[in-house]
Regions:
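Extended, highly charged segments
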Residues: 1-236
């Protein structure tokens, strides 16, 4: 990544050579110029076997090569980060699993994600695991996904636009859906749902964690992402 920081220097050298290269003499090993981006003097190394234009072309080629390298590294870094985040969410699902059928669904997710091969001839298993279901003190149903597949189904197939969605901020955890039935959600239910989102996340052992909450219609699926990964916009 350090080498990619040189790319702008090479681009500027190429531009300056195209601007001031007329003053370079055959056989010169450097060219003194003023960087018109910051007004500072700059010494540009030259290959004495090349013309100023050829030296400029060489620097632009170096710039473009480093730019491509940086773009590739940025994409790879994001891909690795996404994989780590996904595996952390799977680890969280294992932590909150309570029965064998919960583990079966986690295994199915790992097969669908390509981490585990399905045994030859074996069919997709029937999933019997269901989300946790709680009733708030105000009588509202609160559902908690046990894994990414359940999170995906809860948010995008079960919940409707005016239901409320809760999730621990910036960390792997369960999607919590509160069914409103078109009613106003009381403060106590907001707090209870937020506690569920905190408890069923990787931050459950921390003294205090933030929880985001929005109406389900504000939650969007990320194209091409693993199941359960979303984007959303809060209004607070």
């Amino acid at each position: 990544l350090k080498d990619t920081e040189k790319r702008d220097k090479y681009r500027i050298w190429g531009e300056l050579l195209n601007t001031y290269g007329y003053s370079a003499q055959p056989g010169d090993k450097s060219l003194e110029a003023v960087n018109y981006y910051n007004g500072e003097p700059v010494t540009i190394p030259l290959d004495p076997q090349l013309t100023a234009g050829e030296n400029a072309k060489k620097y632009f080629e170096k710039y473009n090569k480093l730019k491509r390298t940086n773009e590739a590294l940025t994409a790879l870094t994001k891909e690795v980060h996404d994989e780590i985040e996904h595996l952390e969410s799977v680890a969280n699902a294992l932590d909150i699993a309570r029965a064998e059928e919960d583990l079966v669904q986690i295994k199915e997710e790992l097969i669908e994600s390509g981490y585990i091969r399905r045994k030859g001839g074996s069919k997709k298993v029937k999933i019997t695991s269901r989300p946790f279901h709680y009733i708030s003190s105000d009588g509202f149903s609160m559902y908690v996904g046990k894994n990414n597949l359940q999170n995906e189904e809860l948010t995008f197939k079960f919940a409707v636009g005016n239901d409320w969605w809760f999730h621990a901020k910036g960390r792997p955890g369960s999607h919590v859906i509160v069914k409103t039935g078109g009613k106003e959600l009381p403060d106590a239910t907001f707090e209870e749902a937020a506690r569920l989102a905190a408890h069923y996340s990787t931050g459950r052992d921390q003294e205090k964690i933030e929880v985001d909450y929005v109406e389900k219609k504000q939650v969007k699926k990320v194209a091409g992402a693993k199941p359960g990964f979303v984007i959303y916009h809060t209004n607070y």
